[in-house]
Amino acid sequence: MTVRTWHRGSKTALMYRDFDLLAGGVPVGEAVSAWVLAGVEDRKLLRLSQMRELEGTEGGGLCKQLTLSKLRMPGEMEERDRRRMGYSDTDINGHVNNTRYADFVCDALRLEGLPRSRFLSDLQIGYTAESRAGDVLTLEVGEQGGQHFVKGVDEAGKNSL
């Protein structure tokens, strides 16, 4: 498996990164992520154009046209799970690693109960707050228009994902 990735460049605080997944050189999947950059000390948003190290590294003709829309949660959600964030869920910065949230979402949706003929074809996660080891997230699920949604709420009632 080969993952090929690049950024699209940006003049605003929002930056897109595109991914191609290849097996034996054949495309088998793709992904898009949207990011904002923030200063480590002051947490102020930065523009990608302020990062001189990244000048000229855009993907050019490889850039995808797909953009991500803001997620609109269903009005009614039901509590499905409470999950304590563990040390093994975190990255070097002490935050829960982004890849772990996809696992939490799939677990909350009970994907193991799907027939083998059905599978997850699209996944969009909106990160709204950082979680750390020891934090507890309540995972709520809901459905709207044939799509399934999962929301993570921290102990203070603030949305995390």
For each feature predicted by the language model, list its residue ranges.
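HotDog/MaoC-like acyl-thioester-processing domains
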Residues: 2-73, 128-136, 142-161
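Generic secondary-structure microfeatures
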Residues: 23, 35-39, 87, 100, ...
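Short amphipathic
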Residues: 75-88
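Active-site helix/loop of acyl-thioester processing domains in fatty-acid/polyketide metabolism
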Residues: 97-118
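Short structured motifs
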Residues: 122-127
